[in-house]
Amino acid sequence: MKILFVASEVTPFAKSGGLADVTGALPKSLKKQGHDVRIILPFYSEVERGGYGIRKGRKSVDVMIGGSVKRGLFRHTNLEDIPVYLLENKEYFSRDHLYGTASGEYPDNHLRFAFFCRGVLDLLKKMDYRPDIIHCHDWQTAMIPLILKKEKGDDLFFSKTGTVFTIHNLAYQGLFPKEAMVDMGLDPSLFTIDCLEYYGKVNLIKGAILTADVINTVSETYCREILTPESGDGLDGVLTLRKNDLYGVLNGIDYEHWNPATDRGISKNFTPGAPAGKAANKKALQKRLGLEIAEDIPLVGMVSRLTEQKGLDLLEALLPRIAKAKLQLVLLGTGDEKYLKLLQEFAALGTDNVSVNIGFHPELAPQIYAGSDIFLMPSRYEPCGLGQMIALRYGAVPVVRKTGGLADTIFDERDQPKEPNGFSFDEYTPEALWEALSRAVEAYSDKAAWKKMMKRGMAGDFSWNTSALKYEELYRLVLAKKGR
């Protein structure tokens, strides 16, 4: 199959979250299955600064956006042996950030990604490249299935091309004023209850849900959750209309990148069969961060966006107890100003068993995974989550809230027929989190049982290989819809 991935971020070129990890890893697994896979993303300043052997292309497109023609130039490089195209427009993409600043999202994001979506489709024609599948990701690419269905339904060039739309996080829907439609090149007739209209605004994800051939989310549990009013973010009714075309496919992690046996960024490599290096990494992390060097004290790691979605309000309520507990907490992340300030003020109190590390420090993240005994993910909701899988790979036992992909990957001995690989809690309360964390801390004192659980987690398979096979099945469903 010829498969084109269209995404607003792709590791290693540009990243703000887990979306980039998926779009950087899944194509490689599909390529290994023998498919013709290609990727396209915007040519951001971040990409330009990174180098990546990017070359100027000969193709360009002219797109009518915001009442004037905007030119896009195409560049190209490779991700291993996968062709990668990048759409350049300095007005829209030569900025310090991908989507906005700490003050908020860029006010012209609707124009930026309308230009991107239209530019992608125009490029395909100029290249005479007809993908079997265009795989779109999140609201930034949601216009592609909409355009193909509503504007290009009679275009023979795309007549055999199908679309898969993946929802990585339903909370981000691409909501814009009705008046923005004209500037995005969208016909006002699409502003209806059965297309783009959503409480007086344009909802791009709604449009994609209603027009993509197949929709999927990034875990089976999250797929079920978003069909309910509690977790559907206002789109549960629309999703229910398409429930026969809605699937859950658990994300994986890149096992070549996240590999404690070969990771050069950690102090000592280790494997499930020879896990002794784990203790050396813990000692190195404690030393680096000024924590007491003690093997008997469980080290709890957390690498996360610092937002309420990730459970920071629960952590906030427990900080006084954590400061007095026989454990160490190492936290890395950036996010909402409220939590940044709170954690910085807490760290300033001189608590000697807590290390707060604010900012994006990619070299520290693998050291935390490798050095932690316990890994904390108390999310309010979590479509999939990658941190818990990386933690398992690096021998850290997760403590998670039982939601979304966390429920599909972490099994607590209390309520799972499967052998346990972590600890979980149901109620979104500080007490429920504290009870689960306390059970983990207590379990750590039984070294033999803990080592067994740790090795079980490390031996689990959360690679992209299984996920890639499931995506192949979705692609075949789409082709069948196209009569192929």
Swiss-Prot record:
Pfam families: Glyco_transf_5, Glycos_transf_1. Pathway: Glycan biosynthesis; glycogen biosynthesis. GO terms for cellular component: cytosol. It catalyses: [(1->4)-alpha-D-glucosyl](n) + ADP-alpha-D-glucose = [(1->4)-alpha-D-glucosyl](n+1) + ADP + H(+). InterPro entries: Glyco_trans_1 (IPR001296), GS/SS (IPR011835), Starch_synth_cat_dom (IPR013534). It is an enzyme of class 2 (transferase). Keywords: Glycogen biosynthesis, Glycosyltransferase, Transferase. GO terms for biological process: glycogen biosynthetic process. SUPFAM superfamilies: UDP-Glycosyltransferase/glycogen phosphorylase. Its EC number is 2.4.1.21. The keyword Zinc-finger does not apply. CDD domains: GT5_Glycogen_synthase_DULL1-like (cd03791). It comes from the Bacteria. GO terms for molecular function: alpha-1,4-glucan glucosyltransferase (ADP-glucose donor) activity; alpha-1,4-glucan glucosyltransferase (UDP-glucose donor) activity. ADP-alpha-D-glucose binds at residue 15. Synthesizes alpha-1,4-glucan chains using ADP-glucose. PANTHER family: ALPHA AMYLASE DOMAIN-CONTAINING PROTEIN, GRANULE-BOUND STARCH SYNTHASE 1, CHLOROPLASTIC/AMYLOPLASTIC. Belongs to the glycosyltransferase 1 family. Bacterial/plant glycogen synthase subfamily. This is Glycogen synthase. It comes from Geotalea daltonii (strain DSM 22248 / JCM 15807 / FRC-32). The lineage of its organism: Bacteria, Pseudomonadati, Thermodesulfobacteriota, Desulfuromonadia, Geobacterales.
